[in-house]
Each structure stands twice: as C-alpha cells, then as structure tokens.
Regions:
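C-terminal and inter-domain tail/linker signature
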Residues: 1-186
Length: 186
C-alpha cells in the first residue's frame, strides 16, 4: 500500500438503528484518522515519505453479524494539502488535524442510554429542520436554537475548522450559503 506502518486512530465509534429506513437496520459509525508514513503514491497524490493523517468517516450496515453495506468518506484534499498540493482556493476556516471529542469519550463500544440517544436524535432533526425551514431572522438566532455558543466546527479541507457561533457564521455558513443555493438535508 501507499502507507507504511498504517494505524487506525479512531476518535468516534457508535452503533444504532437507522431512522431513515424506519429504524429497521443497524449501522455502525466510525470516525478518526488513518496515520502512517506516506511512502508510495496514492491515487495520483505523490508520496512525501513523511507522516500523514488521512481523515475518515465510515458507516457499516450490519445484518446477522455481518457487514452488508459500507460507505467510506476520506478527506483527500487534506492529504493533498499535507504534500503541498492545494487544488482549491483559500479555505475560510483553519486547516487543522481534527481531534476527537474534547472529553475523549467518543468510543461507545457498550450499550448506551436509549432515552439519551432519542433526545440527541430529536435535537439533530430539529437542527436540520431549522436549516431547511429558514424561519429565523438571523443566522445567530437559528444556530442558538441547537448549538452551544462555543461550538466547534471541524469542517473538511476546503472549508476548514472554526470555533464559536459568530466565527462559524463568518467562516463557514455565510460562504457556504451564498455559494450553494437550493440546499436540502435528507
């Protein structure tokens, strides 16, 4: 492979039933970085023979103890930036290696409180509804319905990371909304 001594540096892991299909399937989610020595070219990206961090998010549908379907997302722009290739214009947020949750408690290998999961899902759906409905008079008012004032946004390369509601609006939401008309979630 392209990476020598490859490690999976997992920051988030959880599983649960999928709302999109009426809670009829179980999916497992994992996020973090693959870390290794970038020693050989990878899909046209030249190797630099240095440590590299490849951000990933993967989702697996599990049936009868086996993986039946997988979706894998990797931040190729981040890998390209690590070798000095910048194929898109300057991002509005900061380019960083994204850490896991602040309290380092994102690895949920055991069963969790069902009510807490339902409450979290309701909050996520409310946030998506707020974005789709456009019912608030300002971006600040919209975001404060669901987000903490000192929220962190760990956007992919090309967008970048930002911190606090005000900077999120300035560095991500405003540029994204003015450049992407007609967006919808689920």
């Amino acid at each position: 492979g392209a990476f020598t001594a490859l490690q999976r540096r997992q920051d988030i892991f959880f599983a649960g039933q999928n709302e999109i299909d009426g809670f009829n399937s179980v999916w497992v989610a994992s996020m973090g970085h693959f870390m290794g020595l970038f020693d050989r070219p990878f899909i046209g990206i030249p190797a630099n023979h240095k440590i590299a961090m490849l951000r990933y998010a993967e989702f697996h549908k599990v049936e009868e103890g086996q993986i039946k379907e997988t979706a894998l997302f990797i931040d190729l722009l981040h890998l390209m930036a690590q070798v000095g290739i910048t194929p898109i214009s300057q991002q509005t947020g900061m380019h960083l290696i994204q850490p896991g949750p602040r309290p380092h408690d994102g690895l949920l290998f055991d069963g969790q409180n069902m009510q807490e999961g339902q409450t979290t899902l309701a909050l996520i759906n409310r946030m998506i509804g707020d974005i789709n409905e456009g019912q608030y008079t300002s971006p600040q008012e919209e975001l404060r319905q669901c987000w903490h004032e000192d929220m962190h946004w760990w956007g992919p390369t090309g967008i970048g990371a930002t911190y606090t509601i005000e900077r999120y609006i300035q560095q991500h939401q405003h540029p994204f909304r003015t450049q992407n008309e007609g967006r919808r979630f689920n």
